[in-house]
Design a protein with these regions (language model features):
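Cofactor-binding beta-sheet edge motifs in enzyme active sites
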Residues: 1-171
Length: 171
């Protein structure tokens, strides 16, 4: 990744904050992923445990470089909200009724309860030089990082969503 310094920088920031390479308690596993899109660079580290088919998300670390940053607190809030929406994506799916997508608004989405929200830590590493998004780029690496952590725990690759179709539920 030496030819992609922005990608590597957020990956390293997430890995450092997420204690990548440090031992975890028995039964807890990590996954990591990196993403570039919406004009930003982001990476995530997920920590999970799996008991049977129940997945417990213990911790999420998300690093974001959106270029210029006006409000670090607002960026952190957007990234954290992206995790909530990502959990919804992980566990639910769109349905078609009368030839239309049914889940067209928040009242029809399976938004997670507070009990399903993990500890979310953000690393904001704006470098300036460009204006990037902050909502979607936080959600994008979270899902593959979590799926990689499930793989580390179970040996089962998750290639399609929602997780419930793979036999998993959130603990």
């Amino acid at each position: 990744m030496k030819d992609y310094p922005q990608h590597l920088a957020v990956l390293n920031a997430a890995a450092e904050k997420g204690d990548w390479g440090k031992p975890l308690p028995a039964g807890v596993h990590r996954g990591i992923a990196q993403f570039m899109g919406y004009g930003s660079y982001s990476a995530a580290v997920a920590e999970v445990s799996v008991n049977g088919n129940d997945v417990k998300i213990h911790r999420m670390v998300l690093a974001t470089n959106c270029g210029h940053a006006v409000s670090l607190e607002q960026i952190a809030a957007q990234v954290q909200g992206g995790v909530g929406m990502g959990i919804s994506t992980l566990m639910s799916e769109s349905s078609v009724r009368d030839g239309k997508i049914y889940e067209i608004n928040f009242d029809r989405l399976a938004i997670p309860k507070i009990a399903h929200m993990p500890k979310v830590e953000t690393v904001l590493a704006p470098t300036g030089g460009f204006w990037g998004g902050v909502g979607e780029p936080g959600q994008a690496p979270f899902i593959p990082a979590l799926c990689n952590a499930i793989f580390a725990a179970t040996g089962k690759r998750i290639r399609t969503l929602p997780l419930k179709n793979q036999g998993f539920t959130l603990a």
